[in-house]
UniProtKB/Swiss-Prot annotation:
Keywords: ATP-binding, NAD, Nucleotide-binding, Nucleotidyltransferase, Pyridine nucleotide biosynthesis, Transferase. Pathway: Cofactor biosynthesis; NAD(+) biosynthesis; deamido-NAD(+) from nicotinate D-ribonucleotide: step 1/1. GO terms for molecular function: ATP binding; nicotinate-nucleotide adenylyltransferase activity. Belongs to the NadD family. The keyword Protein biosynthesis does not apply. This is Probable nicotinate-nucleotide adenylyltransferase.
């Protein structure tokens, strides 16, 4: 008599610059984890994003992400993009995660604005083979199921938090507080390491 196969792990992959990571990222990941019953959400800070010229050092962004996610047992952080040389592309991220989790069902979590541009991403045809895609929207966003670029993209509305990393950096640069916009430990990390002191 054969024993039934163990169910496949369901793993979310949330890539981002996380410069800095903020509460909007965490709420989105938590909502997706709950709605899709994911076993784990892996946060993957990008190394050198292909669409951005200047970002804070990867080690700082990695450590802020570790601090921000530490309290949630379903959240982990991967260094695959930080440690890989060269420009970061989603296809490389998913190939690396697939190598370390060969039997898992992967769900790549991204914003609705990014998903509308996905057809221009590197090796887009292979992306659909590596993972399902989850497009996170906020109430009032005009993206609908009919506007999705591929059948294997799921639309999920999450609570609206009008927070952006760009605004957080600018606030720090102007001497304004970012308490309650980013996790407390990240606020302290930014202060300790004098990040974002010049307006960006």
């Amino acid at each position: 008599m054969t024993t039934p196969a163990a169910p496949r792990l369901r793993i979310g992959v949330m890539g981002g610059t996380f410069d800095p990571i903020h509460n909007g990222h965490l709420v989105a990941a938590s909502e997706v984890q709950q709605h899709l019953q994911l076993d784990e959400v892996i946060f993957v800070p990008t190394g050198q994003p292909w669409q951005k010229q200047t970002v804070t050092d990867g080690e700082h962004r990695y450590l802020m992400t570790v601090i921000a996610t530490a309290a949630n047992p379903r959240f982990t952080v991967s260094r695959v993009d930080i440690d890989r040389a060269g420009t970061t592309y989603t296809i490389d991220t998913l190939r690396d995660i697939r190598r370390t989790h060969p039997d898992a069902e992967l769900f790549f979590i991204t914003g609705a604005d990014a998903i509308q541009q996905i057809l221009g991403w590197k090796d887009v045809a292979e992306l659909w083979d590596l993972a399902h895609f989850v497009a996170v929207t906020r109430p009032g966003h005009d993206l609908t199921e009919s506007g999705l670029p591929h059948a294997d993209v799921r639309l999920l509305e999450v609570p609206a938090l009008a927070i952006s990393s760009t605004d957080c950096r600018a606030r720090v640069g102007r001497g304004f507080p970012v308490w309650y916009l980013v996790p407390d430990g990240v606020v302290q990390y930014i202060s300790k390491h004098h990040l974002y002191r010049s307006p960006q």
